Amino acid sequence: MYFPTSATVIEFLILAIVDKEDSYGYAISHTIKKVANIKESTLYPILKKLEKAGYLNTYQQEYQGRKRKYYTTTERGKQQLTFLKGEWQLYTNKIEEIVEGRLEDDEK
């Protein structure tokens, strides 16, 4: 995609992905890469930040003889996701208004 993706948008996407289903880093990264060009080296610090903020919890589960770290949303994470959904809607509505020439200029 042409448009750069901020860390806040990545946080929003992570919360949305994990809220639908507990997931692990590689799977989260694979899903986000469908809309944003990110590297795992970018993703993991954001996952850690969300965990430290209390938005995500982790647990380990064995998969093919190895332990895999899964992420799950907390109640606080669900609240943050709801907030970010609202902010995203406002943001995209304003962009759409500008693109379509419907945004009123307050300084006129």
Residue ranges and their predicted role:
Residues 2-42:
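N-terminal helix-turn-helix DNA-binding core of bacterial DNA-binding proteins
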Residues 47-49:
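Short, hydrophobic-biased segments on the C-terminal half of alpha helices
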Residues 54:
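Glycine-centered, phosphate/nucleic-acid-interacting loop/turn motifs that mediate DNA/RNA or nucleotide
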Residues 58:
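Short beta-strand "wing" residues that participate in macromolecule-binding interfaces
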Residues 82-108:
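Amphipathic alpha-helical dimerization/coiled-coil segments
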